[in-house]
């Protein structure tokens, strides 16, 4: 998730974006730590997965607010795949296909949405608890070059660490 976001931001804003982040001494924290620092006021703004905030709002009654930045958000898809039989220790394509079919069914998607994530079905009738409309997120999506994310990961990670990560 973090690497994909870094690649999307790099492609949209360029290396100067990371230099500017580093100059602001931003903190890099895990999701739960970032939320705790936001609630205590140690941080005034955090970049975090939507589902982390929605979960906290629903389960704990948190009053944390969240928004989509004017310049966009990065959508992180969750993939489902079936491994080729010759590459699989279990060689159970039928079970994999059954799981995939269930995940993509209305029932499977209802569990995804109950987990504070958005359905992959464009016509799914509900959003996660307190979530933004899926179309709104799609309309403001910052695209990720997934091939670049993989093939240039070492140099991009180094660029980010050199400019943003505090030593």
What are the language-model segments listed below?
Residues 44-63:
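A ligand-binding cleft/hinge motif common to bilobed small-molecule-binding domains
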């Amino acid at each position: 998730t973090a690497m994909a976001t870094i690649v999307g931001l790099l492609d949209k804003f360029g290396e100067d974006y990371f230099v500017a982040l580093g100059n602001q001494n931003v903190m890099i924290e895990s999701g739960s730590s970032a939320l705790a620092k936001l609630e205590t006021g140690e941080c005034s703004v955090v970049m975090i997965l939507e589902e982390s905030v929605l979960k906290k709002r629903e389960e704990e009654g948190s009053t944390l607010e969240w928004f989509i930045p004017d310049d966009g958000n990065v959508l992180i898809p969750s993939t489902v795949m079936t491994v080729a039989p010759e590459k699989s220790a279990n060689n159970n394509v039928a079970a994999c296909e059954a799981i995939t079919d269930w995940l993509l069914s209305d029932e499977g998607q209802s569990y995804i949405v109950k987990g504070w994530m958005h359905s992959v079905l464009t016509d799914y009738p509900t959003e996660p608890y307190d979530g933004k409309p899926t179309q709104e997120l799609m309309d403001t999506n910052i695209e990720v070059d997934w091939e670049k994310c993989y093939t240039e990961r070492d140099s991009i990670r180094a660029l980010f660490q050199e400019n943003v990560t505090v030593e």
